[in-house]
Amino acid sequence: MKQLVRFLAALFAAALLLPALSAPARADTIETDAQIAAEWQAAWDFYKFYQVATAPLPYTGRSRVERDISIDIDAPREHVFEVYSNFDNHVGRHSFLQRIVTHKDWTDGGVHYVNFTAIENIPIAGVPVTTKTHGQQRVHPDGFYYETDSWTLPNVVTHQKIVFTDLGDGRTRVTEHLMFEASVLLIDFTVTNGVASHQETQAGLKEAIESGEL
């Protein structure tokens, strides 16, 4: 808990110290993209520390749940992988996702890395609440899979591995291995909404790919 309090304090301080000439804020957030980038760095530093220092065990008040979901798409694996691994294509096909803010994009050792923040409107008790999910995506084109680690207040962690399997005859199976970590009070809400949003995204991308829109 003390680490989380220090993280939040650092996050607030980082936002205040940003230059006044940063890009203007968007309608969906009160922060500029530069401020969101500072939040991403603070969240990532905390995330890395937290993952090493603790584990989701009962005595920590946290829980971990894993789920696998899959969908078959009538399109070649190369095309499905290219479209699906580009998070910009998820906007408009995910009920919560409003936009993606990319902070850094680079390739190292054949792996494509993307540091990003997803701006989402998540319904809580029927009221949409704007949240920021800070994450890193690692795309492995040679293996036809990508991984994502993300962190959202209040200390909700999600690990993803999305695998693309060639079924032959121009068909592809997309399997998402999802791992959610949250407090025992939030884990059911996190898993239910997380799985539902991923299934909605899967269906939206399938329709867009098969129709030729993407």
How should each PLM-predicted stretch be described?
Residues 149-200:
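Beta-strand/loop substructures that line and gate deep hydrophobic ligand-binding cavities in soluble
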Residues 21-27:
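Sec/Tat signal peptide C-region and signal peptidase I cleavage site
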Residues 1-6:
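Positively charged n-region of N-terminal signal peptides that target proteins for export
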Residues 79-84, 90, 146, 174-176, ...:
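Hydrophobic pocket/interface hotspot
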Residues 27-108:
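Hydrophobic ligand-binding cavity/cleft-lining segments
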Residues 65-69, 133, 142, 160, ...:
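Envelope-exposed proteins and targeting segments
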Residues 9-20:
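Bacterial N-terminal signal peptides
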Residues 58-60, 72, 92, 102-154, ...:
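Glycine-rich portal/gate segments that line the openings of hydrophobic small-molecule binding cavities
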